[in-house]
Regions:
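Beta-rich carbohydrate-recognition and catalytic domains
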Residues: 1-22, 31-95, 107-160, 165-183
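Cofactor- and metal-binding active-site motifs of prokaryotic enzymes
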Residues: 99
Length: 183
């Protein structure tokens, strides 16, 4: 007789720390340099409540804000360390004035690349739009800093992070806005 419980898969989980008041979400996991790494986002709103009430510090805010983190995960799935992903140099440009969000880790040819959405929410304030501008970017994540390789302009007002497709020493990126477009 076979006991069914022995054939049931086992699930483990890890908890990503809330570094500031921003709530953790959107993890991306990659194995690179002999380490299990996890990039994740901290956002200033709670998606679980069914509405978007933005906050910044101790008060309400009119705009969303993101922080990006990089964590190292141990073999026991415990979070060994966490730190900010540096994007202030990108925030200093008009194109990405509000930073990056939804970082996706892509180990490729010995480098740790990152796909992300670079955002600017000024159109929300100036043009009374509901959503800001965003562009997909490709960067190298090195020493916790995003080093921009290039941004992609598909002429869509909103771009969310694409999905990497690795094959035959080539890296293709699939746009989520248009999943049949490879770049």
């Amino acid at each position: 007789m076979k006991v069914l419980l022995q054939s049931v898969p086992r699930y483990d989980r890890t908890e990503l720390p809330q570094v500031t008041k921003h709530l953790p979400c959107n993890p991306s996991i990659a194995f690179h340099g002999g380490r299990l790494l996890c990039a994740y986002r901290g956002c200033n709103y709670d998606l679980r409540e069914g509405h978007f009430q933005f906050f910044y510090g101790s008060g309400p805010s009119r705009l969303p804000d993101s922080q990006s983190y990089i964590a190292e995960i141990g073999s026991d799935l415990a979070c060994k360390s966490v730190d900010f992903i540096e994007d202030r140099h990108l925030r200093a440009t008009p194109e990405f004035a509000d930073g990056v969000e939804d970082v996706r880790l892509v180990p490729f040819r010995g480098r740790l690349l990152a796909l992300a959405s670079g955002v600017n929410f000024q159109p929300v304030l100036k043009q009374k739009r509901l959503i800001g501008d965003s562009k997909m970017i490709l960067a190298e994540l090195k020493d916790r800093k995003l080093h921009l390789i290039r941004s992609f302009d598909s002429r869509n007002p909103v771009e969310k992070t694409g999905m990497p497709v690795l094959g035959r020493e080539q890296l293709d990126l699939v746009y989520s806005v248009s999943p049949f477009l490879l770049i």
